[in-house]
């Protein structure tokens, strides 16, 4: 339900490819931080493991939580070269994911800048594929382009385009890594499709009933994520974990005053907001 409200329209071109079985490497662009992984993980009908920036794993509690949802740390030079040697373990763990026949998602740009402009590719995807081929594993490769109607506003239209990698991945020479990245770039540039629509909020009853909670939460998240690219993903996570608490508290208050059954209130508040307050409109 969280994505149904936060992203009221998600279009998927090539959705039939999501049913692929066996080892799968998903190579995607990275326009909107952790929200990209959340959306792809929600719509692929299989467990996905994700490669995520290694610095967020350094606090033990964060590392435990991120690993519990299938994330694997990958370390970048900008986070400290002393951590780069840990990537050997990352690539080995990624190969084991593929060996089990699971899905692995990597954002090949290695950085998120809240833009649909494709950034220079890193070597992570080629390193994983090369190691997999050496181990006798030939994963299917999906190239994914993601486009958002907005990076900051509540409510998004999301376009996802998926294709099978159109060239043969061979890594007999260092030059082949560059060839792979260039082939993916050409394919990805064609797949990124920024929606022509946006989301408008209609100020009705259900909007007003949710407004105090959302204003308070979004202001708090905005302050905590100022100067970063994490506003969307942190807001979504905060909504997912705290909105049920708000629903219970609101339903309990309404039940105490008017004896309205709590279950009815807890269902009516989010569904009514989604159906009456959120509109997809042409920009």
Predicted feature locations:
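Soluble catalytic domains of membrane acyltransferases
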Residues: 4-166, 204, 218-230, 236-282
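Acidic, His- and aromatic-enriched active-site or binding-groove loops in soluble protein domains
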Residues: 164-175
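Long, charge-rich alpha-helical interaction segments
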Residues: 174-182, 186-197
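Transmembrane alpha-helical segments and their cytosolic interface motifs
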Residues: 200-209
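Membrane-water interface of transmembrane alpha-helices
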Residues: 210-219
């Amino acid at each position: 339900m969280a994505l149904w409200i936060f992203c009221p329209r998600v279009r998927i071109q090539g959705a039939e490819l999501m049913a692929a079985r066996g080892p799968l490497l998903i190579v995607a662009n990275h326009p909107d931080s952790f929200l990209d992984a959340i959306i792809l993980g929600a719509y692929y009908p299989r467990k996905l493991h994700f490669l995520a920036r290694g610095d967020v794993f350094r606090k033990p509690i964060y590392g435990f939580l991120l690993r519990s949802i299938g994330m694997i740390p990958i370390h970048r030079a900008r986070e400290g070269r002393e951590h780069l040697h840990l990537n050997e373990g990352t690539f080995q763990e990624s190969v084991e994911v593929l060996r089990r026949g699971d899905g692995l998602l990597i954002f090949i740009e290695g950085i998120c800048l809240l833009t649909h402009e494709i950034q220079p590719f890193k070597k992570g995807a080629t390193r994983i594929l090369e190691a997999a081929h050496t181990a006798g594993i030939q994963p299917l490769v999906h190239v994914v382009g993601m486009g958002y109607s907005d990076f900051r506003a509540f409510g998004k239209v999301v376009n996802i385009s998926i294709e099978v990698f159109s060239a043969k991945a061979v890594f007999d020479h260092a030059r082949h890594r560059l060839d792979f990245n260039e082939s993916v770039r050409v394919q990805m540039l064609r797949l990124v499709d920024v929606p022509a629509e946006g989301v408008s909020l209609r100020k009705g009853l259900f909007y007003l009933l949710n407004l105090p909670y959302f204003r308070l939460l979004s202001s708090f998240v905005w302050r905590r994520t100022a100067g970063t690219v994490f506003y969307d993903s942190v807001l979504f996570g905060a909504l997912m974990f705290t909105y049920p608490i708000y629903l219970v508290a609101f339903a309990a208050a309404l039940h105490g005053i008017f004896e309205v059954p709590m279950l009815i209130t807890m269902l009516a508040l989010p569904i009514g907001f989604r159906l009456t307050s959120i509109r997809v409109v042409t920009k």
